[in-house]
């Protein structure tokens, strides 16, 4: 929603002009880097009746963020959350746990970042498994590494690097 800040601001002005912000609560998805590049946008959205923005942070580990080609850092996530909270807009953040490159250390980094974001006002929406859909760059990398699997229309990858089931449960406690 926020990839074109001028368009989002124009829409917010129209919402305000029509008075929709007094009757309707809006929610949208956004990119963390868009908010960092347009630091007043959360306030504009809040004034127009937006209650929350949903962000895919994906990981608290720089190596995993690079693997997903996010183009952001954990510091960007913290700045984005602060900008939203300061401007009365709830940031809702989601993460991917146990991705193909995750290790015990990267999962710990992600959980630590999620805790910091929550303590600073973010809602943590969910964590999910990565689905490597056919034709995506991640599926291509997994195929190249011999880790990609398909079963009918179910797409998955071999288990996390060195993370057996009992170790995964230990990380979550």
Give residue ranges: language-model regions:
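A structural motif corresponding to the C-terminal lobe/cap of the Radical SAM core domain
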Residues: 5, 12, 16-173
